[in-house]
């Protein structure tokens, strides 16, 4: 399993990759633009090519993922917001594809009371439209649907919901899944023991399919199990705990899936010691199953 880190791109894409290498990350995740602004960052073809070249120069960082802005809401019942979200998703995906990223992680959004079934067709249509507009080739950058913590009317709070979205998009092979450990915990899906982790892997396989699981977001939780709130905590300092995370990370089915550390969420993000801690948790999980 690759242990990666979310890195800041305020100084540019290539410096972000360099920072990932400096802290010992095997993979990086980068926002393609400010996560709380609509205006996409404009990267020239030369800048995107420079990032792809830098990846070859830093083989220790084996994978790049991008994260879409938080403002996107494909499930919105408001036509203006839905259209704005689709355009923003397309812009984010275009940048990720130009960087050679292995996936663009997306929070689907909230139906705001209109209901999951009502929002489902629009969500699926928007996903496929963005994928087609950027790159119809199946080898292009996929969109990775992230599981939600379950707050309010968010879409994707369960793997059953994520499977329904993919099904509504005719099973498009350019759609994958990103599993966030804190969101799992907050949405009331247990995984903190070896038997519970085994059950979770079976659930994923029978809903979205393990082949669609492309990356993990590795976070502890500030809130209790089932609290339905998105609140990340540093590894080992939250209500999941290092042992709970180890139970999941050690599962054999996940060893080819990059795990992206998103904490600490303040300052410059994950540090060398945080990446080392995550590796220790992984090693403990593997030892438990040896």
Annotate each language-model stretch with its function.
Residues 1-68, 72, 76-93, 284-290:
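N-terminal pre-domain/capping segments
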Residues 20, 67, 85, 96, ...:
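Conserved, mostly hydrophobic/aromatic
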Residues 163-290:
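Histidine-acidic metal/acid-base catalytic patches
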